[in-house]
Each structure stands twice: as C-alpha cells, then as structure tokens.
Amino acid sequence: MADGAGMAGVPLDVSGRKPGAAGGIHAVDSDAAVVVDAVHAAQGVRVVDSSGLNHILPVEAGQTLAQTIWLSGELSPPALCSGLGRCGACRVRFLEGTPEPCDADSAILGAEAVRGGWRLACRHAAVAGMVVELPPPPSEKRKRMDIRPDAGPFRLAVDLGTTSIHWHLLDGTGHEAASGQALNPQMGAGSEVVSRLAAARNQEGRERLGHLVIRFLQRVVSDVGVPVAELCIAGNTAMTSILLNEDVAGLCAAPYRLTEPGGRTAELPGLPPAWIPPQPAPFVGGDISAGMAALLYGEPPEFPFLLADMGTNGEFVLALDKERSFIASVPLGPSLEGIGLRYGGVADTGSVSGFRLGPFGLSPVVIGNTEPKRICGTGYLSLLDALLRTGFLDATGRLASASVSPLAARLLGTVERGAAGWSLPLPGGMELAGADVEEILKVKAAFSLALESLLAASGLESRALARVCLGGALGEHMPETALERLGFLPQGLQARTVAEGNTSLRGAALLLTRPELRERLVRWSSGCTLVDLAARPDFTALYMRHMVFG
C-alpha cells in the first residue's frame, strides 16, 4: 500500500499548504501549529509528539483513538495490551476535545492524571477535532560496528515477532556488522496474534499492516548504508502471512489451515529478495523452523530435546533425531514479554528481570543496574515464585487465606483492594495486580499442557529428555529455578534446561550464510508430526487442570 493510501492523511507543509502530490501524513513543528489549516485539522485528530511536532491523522469510523494514532505508521507504538485497558501504555493527554473519563482511566491512571487531561487512548473513540499530546515513544536499539563497504555481500537476518522485530546485518564472512531491535510497528492493531489476524481479515487491513513492517525494513536497509543482497525473515505464521499479503482466513477459525508454507524466496516492495523459512503447520511457523536450523545444523544438543519458542504464540518442537520431530503450538499471549501486565514491559535497561527475597521483603534485580521502571516477563515469573515460596499466594494464584510466614503476613498487610481487585505495592512505585497473576497462570497452563501432550504423543517421559532449549521471551533472561517450582517444567527438568537466546534470529543468519541448508530444513519441516491441541475435545478440561502453580 503506497504512502497516502488508507490510513494516510492530508499532507501539510509548515504554512498549511498542500505540497502537491506528496503522500503520507505530514508533521509540523509546534511553533507552526497555529497556521495549520483549521479545516484539515477539524477533519482529523491532531497529535503532538514528544518532540513538539504536530501530526494530522484522519479518523476512520469505528476506530479507537489508539488505532488512529498507532496504525498511521507515523508514530512509534508503545507495547500495548490489545485495547484491554490494563497496561496504561496508550495514555495520551488531551489538549482539546477531552472526553469524559471512563472507569479504566481512573483505575489505571489515577484521579490526578485524569484531572490533568490524561486518558487511555484504547478506551475512547477517535473524534475529528481532538488534539492530544503523547509521552516519549519507546526507543529503538541499534548497534553499529565498523561497516566496511568492501566487506560484502551484505545480508539481513530478521526475526519478525508479534511484539518486537530483531535484525542482524551480516557481512560477506557471515559476521555481524550491525544489529537492532524495535517494537513491531503493527502494535496499534493490538499485541496478540488474534488481534493482528482480526485486523488483517480483509485486503485493506492486511495491506495496511504489511506495509508498516515493509516500511520498517526499508528504513533499516537504507540506514545501514551498504547494499543488502538478500534477507531472511523468520516469523510466526500470522506475521509471515500478513507480510506476504496472503489470505489469513485459514488462521482465523477452525479447522485451521495454512495457505503460505514458506520455504521460498519472496519479492517485497522496495526490498532485496527475502527467503522465508518453511512453516510446518498453521501455528508453527518460520520462527521456530529457523530456530531448529540453528540447533540442528550448528552444534545440535543430544537427542531427544525440546525447543520451546516462547513468544505471543508458543511453538514447540520435540526432536527425536535430525529427521523426526513432533510439533505443537498454543496461544500464550504477550505476558512472557511483559506486555499487557500492569507494570510490564520488554526486557531492556530499567526492566526488573528478577526479585530476591530478603528479611525485609522483596528487592528487584534491574537490567543495567538503574532505577526500576517496568517488569519484564522473567521478572514476573521470579516475583510469583518468591510470593508462592513465602506463602503470600496459594497454588491457584489467589491470596493465601492464612499467612504461613512473617514475611507473607507483612506483605498481606500492604495489599490494596479496589473495584479492579487486589494489588501488592512493589519497590519503585510499581505494583502486582491480581489480574497479572491470572495472566501468568494462563501461560503456565498452556505451556505445561503443550509439553505434556508432546511427551504423550512421542511415547516419552520427561526424564528421557536430554535437553530443554528455551528461545523467545525466555531465551535471554531465564529465571534459574522458577520454571520448575511454578510448574512450567516437570520436576527434575530444570537442570537440563538452557536459555538459547534468540534461536530464530540465529537460524535466519545461518540460512543466509549457508543457503545449502535451506532444502534440508524444508525436508525437516515436511516430516514433522503435528500434535493438534486445539482439535482435542478435552482441551478445555486439560487446560483447566493445569491452571495451578507447582
């Protein structure tokens, strides 16, 4: 979809004149805002970004203010909770056209912020004439080495995640020349796979979302400053289908079917040729097949092993040997990436990656040794593990009816209760909400059910696994013992569990530097046996049985 189509607005220069046939939404500085054409401003929403630039965004019927702002492609989205009104990341301050506050505004933002004009953009419809101000956007991380133009050919490995996009620029020897990561620009459509699929069911929505990622990749290719010969883009089936503008109807309702098998080179507008890893099943995609390439064709673990790619969609491979594998997938939601939780966020400087128990309570372990700003997924796992050990929580995730330790009694005494449920104050002005515990418990139930089902299908017991390899959200900052105590892993398996980092990105890089492996990976994919959990008539009963910690 070209700039200026669909979500694009009327471009304005600083004098308010239309600049000919130029496409896209134009920004003007705050000093020039007074001369922005009032007619155009009245037809859309005026957004003032953190640098003072004004963006005039068109309003589409039925859209929330969050969708209007962050599906425009003009502003970097925060990590949103799919419009549930829980995370507070979509907060904006109204300068004109302030709507009446809703219950979620008051509960999440607080009375003082609401009086100051702050609202949750996901809870209010976009109305022409509104003027809002945004807080600073999330930063994009980049690492640039000394890129020598004569060191090519250069290739770009991409891990296209639902939440984040990670990339590595490889030189002609296969070494990393630059790298970066950013939130997926499709976040305006929601943080979960199901939200993206809903937005992509029609052609216009699919093109809109695909265009956001294509524009991001075009910018990366342009910014590295050297010719890029080829890409390898590894993503889950939903992200890949949207990127390739393939019909997603088969992923939206049972019986699920896959229209894009991958294992081919795709041509994308304004980009070098992109190889798409094979997608073995409707919700087992190129991200985990690339991860398997990294393990199988690098230094493979002893068989049998399990690879769990813990993203918004959980994908699992139980490899019996180099040719035979059982695969499964379960929707996990973005909780393990810290998204959708009250103080959640991606793992970055200022994120709490763990909690320690001491005689005086909980102390956070912060990435970068700075003041805590948010809690990443592993931080939440560590926190719940600590609260279970003290007796503050019971196995169902509820507050304990009777304290079993002095520390639990002290913590229970600090609990605050309100219309939205209970919350526990934490260091750094943060808090844990009862709803956060429930979200993590859902992830635990899905994870342990998938593992149990794969073991049953393969005829193995957990003690037969030589290794459990964790990728995705748990690949970098794995809680050392929490997974077993929380019940994600059977007893005795934690000692054989390894955080493998970003296996998807590592595999994409390998498939660029050793293209002869691509056909082998396609053969591996075609030989996988799917364990279809969603098709089981007893799925709900089994899932509920796993809705306990430990």
Where are the language model's segments positioned?
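Short glycine-aspartate micro-motif
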Residues: R155-D159, V228-C232, F305-D309, S325-I327, ...
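Local cysteine-cluster metal-coordination motifs and their immediate loop/turn environment
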Residues: S76-T98, V114-V127
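Glycine-rich phosphate-binding loop of actin/hexokinase-like ATP-binding domains
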Residues: W167, G174-E192, G250-T265, A290, ...
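N-terminal phosphate-binding loop and adjacent alpha-helix
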Residues: P185-V224, G340-Y343, S351-R356, E439-K442, ...
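Catalytic phosphate/nucleotide-handling subdomain of diverse soluble enzymes
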Residues: L460-R463, R467-W524
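Fe-S ferredoxin-like electron-transfer domains
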Residues: A33-V36, H40, V45, V59, ...
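Acidic, glycine/GT-rich loop-and beta-edge segments that sit at the periphery of enzyme/chaperone cores
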Residues: V39-R46, W118, P277-S289, L510-G550
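ATP-dependent carbohydrate kinase catalytic cores
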Residues: Y256-S325, P359, A402-L451
